[in-house]
Swiss-Prot record:
GO terms for cellular component: cytosol. This is Elongation factor Tu. It comes from Burkholderia vietnamiensis (strain G4 / LMG 22486) (Burkholderia cepacia (strain R1808)). GTP binds at residues 19-26, 81-85, 136-139. InterPro entries: EF-Tu_GTP-bd, EF-Tu_GTPase, EFTu-like_2, EFTU_2, G_TR_CS, P-loop_NTPase, Small_GTP-bd, T_Tr_GTP-bd_dom. It is found in: Cytoplasm. Residues 174-176 are annotated as: G5. Its EC number is 3.6.5.3. Monomer.
Length: 396
């Protein structure tokens, strides 16, 4: 059977299920594919197909993740589901599966549990912009007041972590009933309500090409008679010949002009997100630009040294450290294309961090890096990765 061509007729959105163990994330994932396939076509996935999530590697870290896709009336969704709590932590911190929105699954029978809280906190730290709640197992709760209480608890928890708890859509249902083909309010109807909430509450994400121009510097060459060429892959936006751009990071920010764009030895009038290009810079010396800097639209990104981050520390089995680290630990932080040394300050209540832990830290780098919240990095010691992290808040 020939592979079907991917029809990009509908806007594409990335989502995922989060929540406490055994609250029904995987059952819900199976139910969504089953119900939406009946209505909009596609391929249904059974529970055990999703549960047997294959291993992947992201930044050298092994993560089990299941990927499914489904359609609604006006969108195409890619959806990730992880079997274990540790997989969620790694997935969200490494950005292996960037989410435009998350579906928080919470059992109406149990209410919010420790991982419910932890996943909401992680979503906040790593910059998941929207959360929709699916209150699962509602068929097991006869008391309407109890349901109301659980809903209130979930809303309060969301508000506590700076999500708009009062305005968050909460869909009540039973993933199990929906999966079994029950057409009632808690069954297939609830799944359609959830699909509707996804379509209306999560805005269509900005495409990479529509963002402000940014290109990490990978290499710098000097071409006699023409000037300095910087190569790299455009991360977002478009750069046109003749436009002003800034060189940001490591050293003080300088402005220059793009006088040429080439790809595969051909001259172009612009380079855009996804392109591997060489950019010719006017009046810039070879020694003015180095790996680790970025070329960017003027004013769109600034250099920083001091920030808070959420990090995952690799376990010994993953090739990480064998021993814990303590306050003022000084590893290298690998941002985009280069390492910068920095020191780590642990939270007051944390004396040390063990391999396999995730923790919120404060970092001070010895040189500034073009940075924004949500930027991913690796933590390295002498070239080997010992952790992964994401910038949560910029301090200065």
């Amino acid at each position: 059977m020939a592979k079907e061509k991917f029809e990009r007729t509908k806007p594409h959105v990335n989502v995922g299920t989060i929540g406490h163990v055994d609250h029904g994330k995987t059952t819900l994932t199976a139910a969504i594919t089953t119900v939406l396939t009946k209505k909009f076509g596609g391929e249904a996935k059974a529970y055990d197909q999703i549960d047997a999530a294959p291993e992947e590697k992201a930044r050298g870290i092994t993560i089990n993740t299941a990927h499914v896709e489904y359609e609604t009336a006006n969108r195409h969704y890619a959806h990730v589901d992880c079997p274990g709590h540790a997989d969620y932590v790694k997935n969200m911190i490494t950005g292996a599966a960037q989410m435009d929105g998350a579906i928080l699954v919470c059992s109406a029978a149990d209410g919010p549990m420790p991982q419910t809280r932890e996943h909401i906190l992680l979503a906040r730290q790593v910059g998941v912009p929207y959360i929709i709640v699916f209150l699962n197992k509602c068929d097991m709760v006869d008391d309407a007041e109890l349901l109301e209480l659980v809903e209130m608890e979930v809303r309060e928890l969301l508000s506590k972590y700076d999500f708009p708890g009062d305005d968050t859509p909460i869909v009540k249902g039973s993933a199990k009933l929906a999966l079994e083909g029950d057409t009632g309010e808690l069954g297939e109807v609830a799944i359609m309500n959830l699909a509707d909430a996804l379509d209306t509450y999560i805005p269509t994400p900005e495409r990479a090409v529509d963002g402000a121009f940014l290109m990490p510097v990978e290499d710098v060459f000097s071409i006699s008679g023409r000037g300095t060429v910087v190569t790299g892959r455009v991360e977002r936006g478009i750069v046109k010949v003749g436009e002003e751009i800034e060189i940001v990071g490591i050293k003080p920010t300088v402005k220059t002009t793009c006088t040429g764009v080439e790809m595969f030895r051909k001259l172009l009038d612009q380079g855009q997100a996804g392109d591997n290009v060489g950019i010719l810079l006017r009046g810039t010396k070879r020694e003015d630009v180095e790996r680790g800097q970025v070329l960017a639209k003027p004013g769109s990104i600034t250099p920083h040294t001091h920030f808070t981050a959420e990090v995952y520390v690799l376990s010994k089995d993953e090739g990480g450290r064998h021993t814990p680290f303590f306050n003022n630990y000084r590893p290298q932080f690998y941002f985009r294309t280069t390492d910068v040394t920095g020191s780590i300050e642990l939270p007051k209540d944390k004396e040390m961090v063990m391999p396999g832990d995730n923790v919120s830290i404060t970092v001070k780098l010895i040189a500034p890096i073009a940075m924004e919240e949500g930027l991913r990095f690796a933590i390295r010691e002498g070239g080997r990765t010992v952790g992964a992290g994401v910038v949560a808040k910029i301090i200065e």
